[in-house]
Amino acid sequence: MEQITARELAYADIKVGDKAELSKQVTDADIMAFANLTGDFNPVHVNEEYAKKTPFGGRIAHGMLTAGLISAVLGMKLPGANAIYMKQELAFLGPVKIGDTVTATVEVLEKIDEKSRIILRTSVTNQAGKLILDGKATLMKK
């Protein structure tokens, strides 16, 4: 994934309906790095022989690896710098396999001006456009 600079948006400049996204191809190296970082070595993620016997038919990425891409969009693009993650609801709807290209998208649903809060829909789709993760985030924007 390319290095990007966090976008600097003022709270007042963020509007309901604004969207941002980030796409990434998920690799074996990503999955292994996530396993090493978190200590989650569940064999469905790291052992191909084991994973072949599961309903997935092979290794899949950790759900939270996929969800982590949402954090990247929120922190780097919308709402960007000076935003604090307060809450995240997630529903994992399908697997991410090695080689899949996933796109994390956020969309501003609501602003709560008196608390400088932003509520966003958070979703991830795969290269076929299938929704694989859906949720809602609440952030505080300075």
Residue ranges and their predicted role:
Residues 1-2, 6-16, 96-142:
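HotDog/MaoC-like acyl-thioester-processing domains
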Residues 2-61:
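Catalytic strand-loop segment that frames the active site of acyl-thioester-processing enzymes
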Residues 21-25, 91, 107, 138-140:
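Generic structural detector for well-ordered beta-strands
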Residues 33, 50, 86, 115-116, ...:
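Sparse recognition of residues in long alpha-helices and their boundaries
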Residues 36-40, 75-79, 127:
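Short, intrinsically disordered, mixed-charge
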Residues 52-61, 67-105:
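Hydrophobic beta-strand-centered segment that forms part of the acyl-chain substrate-binding groove
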